[in-house]
Swiss-Prot record:
HAMAP family: Trp_synth_alpha (MF_00131)
PANTHER family: TRYPTOPHAN SYNTHASE ALPHA CHAIN, CHLOROPLASTIC (PTHR43406:SF1), TRYPTOPHAN SYNTHASE, ALPHA CHAIN (PTHR43406)
Family: Belongs to the TrpA family.
Assigned EC number: 4.2.1.20
Species whose genome carries this gene: Dictyoglomus turgidum (strain DSM 6724 / Z-1310)
Descriptive protein name: Tryptophan synthase alpha chain
Pathway: Amino-acid biosynthesis; L-tryptophan biosynthesis; L-tryptophan from chorismate: step 5/5
PROSITE patterns referenced in this protein's UniProt entry, alphabetically: TRP_SYNTHASE_ALPHA (PS00167)
Residues of the active site: 46, 57
InterPro entries reported in the protein's UniProt record: Aldolase_TIM, RibuloseP-bd_barrel, Trp_synthase_alpha_AS, Trp_synthase_suA
């Protein structure tokens, strides 16, 4: 059993809280202070490595990716910072990155991720067929490859993903790109209700969450929630996010 599956199996709260931040935004110093201050509230940290064409992201995260890249944030600086700051030593971190950032020296990169104490990878542009062949290599370095499912995933493909997924399932519960939504989409709720009957693997709701009432409504349906764009929007506006972050966290208890 993978480290993350074991973590979900032993969870003692209603939902795992999985905040998403883009590496280096608004600065490495801010992230280090904020994340370590709140490490006991963060069950898993999803950290995005800035990329020039983040196809799954809405306008907020696209802008944040751009600003981080302009400042020179990349995969190497992200890994160096994780080690230097102690963030990956104190918090379970999964990286979101695009495959062409690592494919040329794949095994060398996976070893470095392991040495950095990364727990898993989310790779939006990785075809399922390639993911299937890579899972043994990821397992060699004790890294979870986290797979996506969505309401548009075909039944045959869904069965294959549910069977081969080595970790929790990242449920894209709305159509389109990342971003805040005012309410939970009925399609997403019914989709996850159906999937829940077909697998015992943990399900995590991604995309569209922005407030505590949405999170509270997901208790009993999913095992964890990811909040990214709503946090990023407040950071873009130079807002103090602590009170908002605490509100989201309390909703997962």
């Amino acid at each position: 059993m993978s480290n993350l599956l074991e973590k979900f199996k032993n969870k003692s709260k209603s939902l795992f809280f999985i905040p998403f931040f883009v590496s280096g935004f608004p600065s490495f110093d801010f992230l280090e202070v904020f994340l370590l201050k709140n490490k006991d509230k963060i069950d898993i940290l999803e950290l995005g490595v800035p990329f020039s064409d983040p196809v799954a992201d809405g306008p907020v995260l696209q802008e944040i990716n751009y600003r981080a890249m302009v400042r020179g944030v990349n995969l190497n600086s992200t890994l160096d910072w994780l080690v230097r700051s102690g963030v990956s030593r104190n918090i379970d971190v999964i990286l979101l990155l695009y495959f062409n950032l690592i494919q040329n020296k794949l095994e060398e990169n996976l070893k470095r991720f392991k040495d950095t104490e990364i727990k898993g990878l989310v790779i939006p542009d990785l075809p399922m067929e390639e993911a299937e062949t890579l899972i043994p290599l990821f397992n060699k370095y004790n890294l979870d490859l986290i797979l996506f499912i969505s309401p548009t995933t075909r039944d045959e493909r869904m069965k294959k993903i549910l069977k081969m997924a080595p970790s929790f399932l990242y449920c894209i519960s709305v159509k389109g790109v990342t971003g805040e939504r005012d309410k939970l989409p009925e399609e997403g709720v019914s989709f996850i209700s159906r999937i829940k009957k077909e697998t015992d693997k943990p399900l995590v709701w991604g995309f569209g969450l922005s407030n505590s009432s949405q999170i509270a409504a997901l208790k009993g349906l999913v095992d964890g929630v990811i909040v990214g764009s709503a946090i990023g929007k407040r950071l873009l506006n130079n807002e103090d996010i602590q009170e908002y972050f605490d509100e989201l966290y309390r909703a997962t208890l």
